[in-house]
Amino acid sequence: MNAIISPDYYYVLTVAGQSNAMAYGEGLPLPDREDAPHPRIKQLARFAHTHPGGPPCHFNDIIPLTHCPHDVQDMQGYHHPLATNHQTQYGTVGQALHIARKLLPFIPDNAGILIVPCCRGGSAFTAGSEGTYSERHGASHDACRWGTDTPLYQDLVSRTRAALAKNPQNKFLGACWMQGEFDLMTSDYASHPQHFNHMVEAFRRDLKQYHSQLNNITDAPWFCGDTTWYWKENFPHSYEAIYGNYQNNVLANIIFVDFQQQGERGLTNAPDEDPDDLSTGYYGSAYRSPENWTTALRSSHFSTAARRGIISDRFVEAILQFWRER
C-alpha cells in the first residue's frame, strides 16, 4: 500500500442518482479484504461520524471513503445478518470505493481520489417528495426529486463545488450517474430525457467558475450506468426512452456505461445470483430477510459482487477512455 496519507491534491468524482448508484449491494462487507479503505481515497462527509462508532466529522469534511458512503440516504444501519462487527462490517456495499481503487494506478502517487456522494434511493425526476436543503446539512433524508432547482440538485452542485474549492489543484473527473428506475414506472417517463438533459446543462453552467479544474473543457462528462435485467424485461418501452437517451444523447460528453449483453441475466441481489464465496469469507444476499434487506424486489439492484467487479470495472474503463482522448 502506498505510504502517502495526505495527498497533495485530489481527482474529484461525483457519484449521484438513485439506489443502484449507491450502497445497495446486500452481500457481506469485507473491510479487511476486498472492501478495505485506502489512505489516498477519501469522500466528502455528510453524517455526524465518519462511520458507526467512529470519530465525529462535519458536513463536507474530507474523510476516509468506505464501502458504505455518506449519501443522502444513510445505508449504514442495513447490516448483513452474518456481520460480526457493526463498526467495520456495517451496512451495505457500493461501487464508489472500487471505482476509486481501480483509478489509483493511473494518477500520480502524490494525488488521491475524492468521492462526492450524492445518491438517494428511490429518487426520480417525475415522482417523489422534494424534501429540503440547507447549507449546513445538504439535502434532507426525504429528498427524492431530481431537477434543476430541487434539494437533491442543490446538494449535487454545492458538494461538487465544495470538493473543488478545497484546493485549486483538485481536478474534476466527472459524474458517475445511475438513475431512471423509479421514472420507468411512472406515466410521465417520456419526459425524463428532457429533465435529465436540462439538469446536466444547469450543472455544467453552475461549475463554470471551476473551468480550469475541468482541464478547460466546457462540458463536464457524465458517465451514465445501465440498470439490472429486471427493469429492462419488465419496462421495455420506458427503458428505451430513458436509457436510450443516455446511449444517444444530443449533449456532448454523455457516456453510457453498460454491464451486460441484451437479454443477459445475473449480477443482482437475487439470492441465486449472489452466491457465497467461502474462499474469501463472503456471504451473499440469501441470509437477508424483510428486517434487513433493501427491498423485497431483489433483482432490482446490483449485487455486492457486481459492484466490486463489472460495475466498477466498466466505469473506470469509460473514465480512462474519456480523459485519454483529451
Swiss-Prot record:
It is found in: Periplasm. The keyword ATP-binding does not apply. Its EC number is 3.1.1.-. Disulfide bonds: none annotated. Keywords: Carbohydrate metabolism, Hydrolase, Periplasm, Signal. One of its GO terms (molecular function) is sialate O-acetylesterase activity. It is an enzyme of class 3 (hydrolase). Disruption phenotype: Cells lacking this gene cannot grow on Neu5,9Ac2 as the sole carbon source, in contrast to wild-type, but grow as well as wild-type on glycerol or on N-acetylneuraminate (Neu5Ac). Induction: Induced by N-acetylneuraminate and modulated by N-acetylglucosamine, via the NanR and NagC regulators. Residues 1-21 form the signal peptide. GO terms for biological process: carboxylic acid metabolic process; N-acetylneuraminate metabolic process. InterPro entries: Carb_Esterase_6, SASA, SGNH_hydro_sf. The keyword Nucleotide-binding does not apply. Probably catalyzes the hydrolysis of the 9-O-acetyl group of 9-O-acetyl-N-acetylneuraminate (Neu5,9Ac2). Is required for growth of E.coli on Neu5,9Ac2, an alternative sialic acid commonly found in mammalian host mucosal sites, in particular in the human intestine. This is Probable 9-O-acetyl-N-acetylneuraminic acid deacetylase. It comes from Escherichia coli (strain K12). The gene is nanS.
